């Protein structure tokens, strides 16, 4: 386990432990966050606890040709129940991701400090959001880090059925059109698996991340 201080430094991802934890400490300075994502590392920790930096093996990703859109979801998309926008209200999206209640979780890992840091990355054009609207009301969305050829998804929320799925599918289709290589989903999630995401070796993920 590496301990981070003020220096902008991360150890090789191969040094992560079996759970995927690579380092502890440091801060959420935008420059550190940018270095982290470019290095295949992301922060994930509970509010009030030290910052943990992760580089899990395997890594959950979506290759766009493997995106699964069910028949029922296609009907919803075709009915145009929702309106999808990009980067129209980043702060409201990340705030909703913080506040939404999730099954099996007592609290949130998205602290106010994280919101401030990612909003700064949004101002720099690096953190981006997808918004899903119904009758002019924000009902779903997601946010993440855009590396230009890989998009690192961070969190999503849904206030009505299928809103977060709509955000995810819309983003995947957009990234495919723009010739991105993959959508990074970080760790296994059965919901994401149903949409076509799968786990790959960290070595393969890093190879794709470092190629442009």
UniProtKB/Swiss-Prot annotation:
Name the protein family. Belongs to the L/F-transferase family.
PANTHER family according to UniProt: LEUCYL/PHENYLALANYL-TRNA--PROTEIN TRANSFERASE, LEUCYL_PHENYLALANYL-TRNA--PROTEIN TRANSFERASE
Q: Which UniProt keywords apply?
A: Acyltransferase, Cytoplasm, Transferase
Q: Cytoplasm: present as a keyword of the record?
A: yes
Catalysed transformations (reactions): N-terminal L-lysyl-[protein] + L-leucyl-tRNA(Leu) = N-terminal L-leucyl-L-lysyl-[protein] + tRNA(Leu) + H(+); N-terminal L-arginyl-[protein] + L-leucyl-tRNA(Leu) = N-terminal L-leucyl-L-arginyl-[protein] + tRNA(Leu) + H(+); L-phenylalanyl-tRNA(Phe) + an N-terminal L-alpha-aminoacyl-[protein] = an N-terminal L-phenylalanyl-L-alpha-aminoacyl-[protein] + tRNA(Phe)
- The gene name reads aat
GO annotations of cellular component type: cytoplasm
The protein here is known as Leucyl/phenylalanyl-tRNA--protein transferase
Main subcellular localisation: cytoplasm
